[in-house]
């Protein structure tokens, strides 16, 4: 006569980390659910912080004139226009006239706020979906303004602007703000739960 045994599984203990989404609220998908390896989550967090520097450094340099790409007398706070000069004289390719027509104080503000907003979102790990759209638009415009498809460019298809856009997509889809960031708490806010595009 054979005996059968019944295996019972204990419910996951939220305090032990067995239920990744439990800490952020029931039904909420977190990075632990999407990226299962801890090392991968940490690598994505490093990439996110590196991406933050890509946006925040030019913002600070153009605002203060730190002497790297922007000399002190060309700082925004010194009265210079961070985007106008480039749009009027630095754009290459067939869209040069279009970009020159866009030059003005409004584009200066949009450019600087874009750098600051996307950089802070990446640094804090919140609002990555909005940041990805804004960052992709900003870097897409920069790609068009440099027109790398012209002869003599380093790479006519994928340059640093395209790589940053791809990085933003990866960081957003892997919920990279949850590790070493405020993404998990941000996602649990009632407003963000009602409007997931804010995540």
Task: Label each region the model flagged.
Residues 1-89, 94-117, 124-199:
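Extended, low-polarity transmembrane helix blocks
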